[in-house]
Every structure is written in C-alpha cells, then in structure tokens.
C-alpha cells in the first residue's frame, strides 16, 4: 500500500492504532527486570475503579432505550413501508444502525463495566491503566453515537433518492463526503475505544503474572483476553470494510460479499468478542447468584469449545466471502453460480456452524447446571438468557442447510430479515438479558442500591417482548419471502402485510422498550 493512496481518515486511524500498540509495548517491554510481588494487593486497590462502574451501566441502559425506541418507530406502518421501498439505504436505517446502538452501546459498555470489576480480582492486581479504561468508555460511546447518527441520516437521505429511481451506488456517490466522513470517523473512534479496552485487559493480565499469590479464579482471565482480542479483530475489520473502495467491492460482490460483512464481522465481534467476555464475567460472578462455579477443568473445556467453534466459523465465512466474492467481481459470475463453483461451500459452513453450536451448548449446559439450584435474584435473568441463546443458536445451523439457505436467498430482503432476527434473539434476548441481570446484581453488591423491587418489570417485558418480536418476525418475514419469491418487490410484500405486522411488532417492541427503560431507571 502506498501512502499516497491513503485518505486522511485512514492515515489518522492507522496512527491512532499505532499509538495504542506502542503504548502497550512500552508497558510490556520495560527496561529492567520487573518487580515480583509476593503479597496480595489490598482489597481497596483492587476495587479502585469500582466507584466508576455505574456510569457504564447507565450509558448502556441509555443506548438500550434509544435502540428500543428505534425498534418501535421502524415498525410503524408508514415507516416500515418506506424503509422496505428504500432498498439498501433502508437496511442501514432499519437494521444496521439499530443493531449497532443496542449491541455495542448496550452490550459492550455493560460488559466493560463488569470486566473492570472482575479482571483485577481474577489476576490479583489493579487495572493497569485508569486512563485506558476512561478512554475505552468515552471513545466507544462517542464513536457509536456519531456512527449511529451518520447511518440514520445518510440512510434516510439515500433512501429518498432510491425511492425516486436512483441506484444505491449513484445515491452513495451523490452523498460523497457527507456519507464517507461521518461514517468513517464514527467507526474509527469506536475502534480506538475498543483498542483501549483490549490494551487495558491485556496489560492488566500480563502484569498480573508478577503477583505471586493464590488466584482461585485466575484461569478465567483468558475468557476476557480472548473476548478483547475478538473485539479488536472485529473493529479493525469494520474500519477496513467501511473504506469506500472496500465497501464498493463488498456491494458488487452481492450475496457472496455478505459472508464477510455482516456475517464474519458480526460473528467475530459477537461470538469471539462479546460472548467470551460475558462467559468470563458470568463464571466469576456465579457465587453472587448463590451458585457454585464450574471446576477449572470444565471452565477450560467451555473456553476451548467456544473459542474453537467461533474461530472455525469465522475462518470459513471469511474464506467463502473472499473466494466467492472474487468470482463474482472479477469472474462475472452471479453469487449463486459462485456458490455452485465452490464444492466446499456447504461443508465449511456446516462444519464451522456445528462446532460453534456445540461450543455454545456446552457453555449453556454448564451455566444452567450451576444456576438452576441457586436462589439469587439474578437467577431468572441468566436462565431466560440461556433459553433465548439455545433457540437462537439452533437457528444458525438450520438456516445454513443448502435447502433452507436457498429459500432464504429466494426471499431476498425478507430472507435477510429472518437471518437478522436470529442474531437479534441471541444478542437481545440472550446475552443482553444476562448482562442486565449481572449489572443489577453488581450494583447491589457494591452498595450503590439494593436489588430493585421492580426488577420483574425489567425481565418480563424485555424477554417477553424479544420472544414475541422474534416469533412474529419469523412468521411475517416468511410470508413476505414467499411473496418476494413470487415476483413481488419487498416493498410490495411489506405493504400487503400492514397493518397486521405493526399490530404485532409495535407492541412487542414497546415491551422491549419498557423492560430496558426499567433497567436504565434502576
């Protein structure tokens, strides 16, 4: 790559990443023999960052409320009809922006707070850098807010052009820097926040090796390390693929390019990243639930199965995206022809998907076995989240079957909505519900406030709303997909389902909004 081919945004992104790497190396490679500590750190030093943890949960709750409100608005009849007719820009507004604000804003910020509580106690030393912890919070929150606003605003602007007959590529070119600059800046700033988080996790764990004292939960840090590494890889990939040339290549690759974005990008962020972090803090906090944590051997088995399965699927998706995308972009094949020309397509997807499913189910079985006898107040949150994850992870291999995958492809955008609902159930109904319960539990443990009496108004509306939204969304999207396969446009198919679609999805989204609003208020 030549420097004259770098945009200013790319250059600044690489500089910021280099600064974080150099700072980490500076801490990892001291000029003299590092001192070994044989006495445990005092509890007050390990808890130095605890008083700042509520801001992570408050900000996460705020983003969850914003995302839930977005869910309500996008399912109003006239809004849903317009978004369906807006083509790919409608997807930016309907799905991409909504997913990012809830999963990154809600999930990542909440799990960051839980990580800063658990990690020092796992490795036996305080956080390596308070500055990196603050930077991770503010860069992630600010970058996400900019990214969200940029996607919504540009999606609406480009959607109006597409609705008047423009092609998406022409509409995107027409927006020019109004699209590229804020989206790229938002992604870059978010990436810096994630890199600060990952650097602090790695530095703290690395320096923890110098503390030579008993660490009963020391084996759990690798969940947090792997999760931080997964988020780093995912954000680097995200920054790269929003660059104009790469985004254009992915768009021209069509369905083949979707194996790279959103599939591989989402999986490395959400499974290798967020799920591993959630597993680590959940195993650590099990005693607060009144549960017995799994043995070191079983925890290590869960780690190996989750990490191996997620990386197997990530590698398979990346390979198929680049290989089949090249056949489409350079070879002139259609995505369907490129898939047929790849004999290993089904084998790779089924192998990676099955490995990931087995890893998830081993983790879920371990958690349910530990939590079921417990009587702690967060028990219901964990069990509800595990139930949603069991259903959501089962859908993944099912939709990878060639016959099912072909039906989804024939359904066009309606088929893509079904795939998105699978991820939404896993994240909102699964991991997010678990994280919300753990955050409320930790606030009570820290003495910030007692376990809220209205906690049931968090769990029941949120879990119930996500469940209804998922089931109804699958059924309605299946009907829309059959209409699209019958030569209707997606906009016509959605219009034919109104107002019945809104009568089901809007109340379900309101339930999600009520549940997460109760959490934010707590």
What are these regions (language model features)?
Residues 1-522:
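Hydrophobic alpha-helical transmembrane segments of multi-pass integral membrane proteins
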């Amino acid at each position: 790559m030549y420097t004259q081919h770098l945009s200013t945004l790319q250059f600044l992104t690489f500089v910021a990443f280099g600064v974080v790497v150099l700072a980490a190396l500076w801490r990892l490679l001291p000029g003299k023999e590092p001192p070994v500590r044989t006495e445990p750190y005092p509890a007050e030093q390990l808890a130095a960052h605890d008083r700042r943890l509520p801001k992570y949960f408050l900000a996460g709750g705020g983003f969850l409320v914003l995302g839930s409100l977005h869910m309500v608005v996008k399912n109003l009849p006239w809004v849903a009809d317009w978004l369906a007719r807006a083509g790919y820009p409608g997807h930016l507004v309907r799905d991409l922006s909504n997913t990012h604000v809830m999963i990154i804003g809600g999930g990542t910020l909440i799990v960051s707070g839980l990580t800063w509580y658990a990690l020092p106690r796992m490795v036996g030393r305080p956080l390596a850098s308070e500055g990196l912890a603050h930077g991770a919070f503010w860069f992630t929150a600010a970058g996400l807010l900019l990214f969200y606003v940029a996607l919504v605003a540009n999606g609406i602007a480009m959607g109006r052009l597409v609705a008047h007959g423009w092609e998406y590529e022409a509409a995107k070119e027409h927006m020019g820097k109004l699209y590229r600059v804020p989206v790229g800046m938002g992604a870059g700033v978010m990436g810096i926040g994630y890199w600060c988080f990952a650097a602090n996790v790695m530095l703290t764990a690395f320096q923890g090796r110098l503390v030579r004292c008993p660490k009963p939960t020391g084996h759990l840090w690798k969940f947090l390390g792997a999760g931080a590494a997964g988020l780093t890889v995912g954000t680097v990939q995200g920054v790269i693929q929003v660059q104009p040339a790469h985004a254009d290549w992915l768009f021209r690759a069509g369905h083949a390019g979707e194996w790279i974005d959103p599939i591989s990008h989402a999986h490395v962020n959400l499974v290798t990243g967020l799920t591993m972090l959630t597993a680590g803090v959940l195993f650590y906090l099990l005693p607060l639930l009144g549960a017995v944590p799994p043995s070191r051997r079983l925890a290590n088995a869960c780690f190996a199965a989750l990490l191996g399965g997620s990386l197997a699927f990530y590698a398979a998706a990346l390979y198929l995206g680049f290989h089949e995308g090249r056949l489409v972009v350079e070879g002139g094949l259609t995505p369907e022809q490129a898939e047929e020309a790849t004999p290993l397509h089904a084998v790779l997807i089924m192998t990676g998907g099955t490995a990931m499913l087995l890893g998830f189910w081993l983790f879920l079985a371990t958690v349910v076995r530990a939590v079921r006898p417990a009587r702690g107040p967060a028990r219901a949150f964990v069990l509800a989240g595990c139930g949603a994850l069991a259903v959501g992870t089962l859908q993944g291999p099912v939709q990878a079957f060639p016959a099912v995958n072909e039906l989804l492809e024939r359904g066009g955008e309606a088929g893509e909505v079904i795939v998105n609902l699978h991820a939404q159930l896993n994240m909102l109904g699964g991991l997010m519900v678990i994280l919300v319960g753990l955050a409320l539990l930790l606030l009570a443990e820290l003495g910030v406030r007692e376990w809220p009496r209205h906690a049931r108004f968090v769990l029941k509306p949120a879990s119930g709303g996500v469940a209804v939204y998922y089931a109804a969304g699958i059924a309605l999207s299946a009907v829309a997909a059959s209409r699209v396969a019958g030569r209707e446009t997606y906009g016509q198919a959605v219009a034919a389902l109104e107002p019945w679609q809104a009568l089901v999805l809007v109340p379900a989204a309101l339930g999600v909004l009520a549940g997460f609003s109760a959490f934010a208020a707590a």
